[in-house]
Design a protein with these regions (language model features):
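N-terminal, charge-rich interaction modules
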Residues: 3-6, 10-29
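Conserved active-site segments centered on acidic
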Residues: 14, 37, 73-76, 235
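A short, surface-exposed helix-loop junction/capping segment
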Residues: 9-14, 53-60, 234-238
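Nucleotidyltransferase catalytic core that binds NTPs
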Residues: 3-5, 30-32, 53, 86-271
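Short, structured active-site "lid" loops
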Residues: 57-85, 251-265
Length: 271
């Protein structure tokens, strides 16, 4: 009998539904969740883009790193978007996107660290868990068991069943970004844009600005000289050819801009 049986039963009986994406590890958690009766009440989709080419296809791009927080956040944001498309009857507040990337012990010695990342995207927040193993200390099965535990703990917390991940360990870093009300309105399509200025932007400079660098500033200054208009940096939170931005990514992007730069958030994925 699974040690997670009662927790998973409560997940299936909760009012939440979710899409779960796993790459490089975490498939044991999917198995644990699906083998408990009632999984169709909560699981909308479980997807395993295991090969690098499969993850490229899922993200519509080749990520800088296949096992990283940024990649996992993108996967979770896309999973949440998929949940909203699959289940149009459930309120977005009751839908979740969960993703995990992992680099675990295998049949050869890895150069990099053994680690995993879990991200949960919801209507109101993004939640991330970054964990680094002590390399060579545990077997693959032992590492996978820890990944499974954290996925189920994080998921049960997101479903309101318990407090979720409560571990106090230097191996783990937890970050939660709560969405501003305006971000939620933009995601829900209730407003068309959010601007750092009270003025309607006249000159738009679109880009991901991940990160913002001196070249962007030089282009902005040149555009202002040629047009006489003050440019606003546009960050599209949901491009046609990219996964949506998580709240982590939205916050990190807008915090780059000093008060001397205007910016605007939109959902205008196409011109």
């Amino acid at each position: 009998m699974s040690q997670y049986l009662e927790t998973i039963k409560k997940i299936h009986n909760s009012s939440f539904r979710f899409v779960l994406i796993s790459s490089g590890g975490g498939t044991n958690a999917i198995s644990e969740i699906l083998k408990v009766p009632g999984a169709s009440n909560s699981v909308l989709e479980a997807y395993v883009p295991y090969a690098k080419e499969s993850l490229d296809h899922y993200l519509l791009r080749q990520p800088d790193h296949y096992c990283s927080l940024d990649t996992t956040l993108s996967m979770a944001a896309k999973a949440y978007s998929a949940a909203k498309k699959i289940d149009t009857k459930t309120h977005p507040k009751k839908l979740l996107g969960i993703a995990v990337t992992a680099s675990l012990a295998t049949n050869y010695s890895k150069k990099g660290d053994h680690k995993f990342f879990i991200a949960i995207q919801t209507h109101k927040y993004s939640h991330s868990f970054s964990y680094q193993f002590t390399k060579g200390e545990l077997s693959r099965d032992q590492e996978e068991a820890i990944v499974t535990k954290y996925i189920i703990d994080a998921l049960s917390g997101a479903c309101g069943i318990n407090e979720g991940v409560q571990d106090q360990t230097p191996n783990l870093r937890i970050e939660k970004v709560k969405a501003e009300k305006s971000w939620i309105k933009l995601v829900d399509g209730k407003i068309e844009f959010i601007s750092s200025s009270n003025q309607i932007p006249e000159l738009i400079f679109p880009g991901s600005f991940n990160p913002l660098h001196s070249g962007h500033a030089e282009m902005s200054e040149l555009a202002e000289k040629k047009t006489g208009l003050s440019p606003a940096y546009e960050i599209c939170i949901q491009n046609a050819d990219k996964p949506p931005l998580s709240y982590h990514e939205i916050q990190r992007t807008v915090l780059q801009f000093s008060q001397s730069y205007d910016w605007v958030l939109t959902k205008a994925g196409k011109f």
